[in-house]
Amino acid sequence: MKSKIFNTQEVQAILDGRKTQFREVIEDISIVKMIKCETSTPNDFSKYKTGDTVFVKETFLQKDARILFEITNVRVEKLQDISDEDCIKSGIYKTLDKSGCFSSYVFTVIRPIVIDDFIYTDYYCSEFEAYEELWNSKAKEDYKWEDNPYVFVYKFERVDR
């Protein structure tokens, strides 16, 4: 069985049912060309294949893994082609600010700053902007949002042991 590493906030989003997809960079552009020519499918080259059961890598042994999911779809797209709906499926969510007013989008991977017992987080005007910040917080050099790399898009569903 294959594993996938997520940060603490992403694991919580999976447990809450808010995260049902993730993206990984395609480093070899020739793969994209073969898929576009329809001589191959994303499943031919992706690390995770449709139907694979994957466990969330934690400090436990694989046999003790708490979170399992099944890959239900794999596709290829440019990173910046992500839809607002897919941003939400990647763990971005709307939240209420402390005043109770409806605020912009925020993703909890942004570290809050506490000043005089008030928690400040980074808020964004759209799902798209929040996802851009999330991506750049985790991306390797040469694969930042601005580089707009091709990515495998993995959709998944949680499964029970």
How should these model regions be labeled?
Residues 1-161:
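Secondary-structure transition motif
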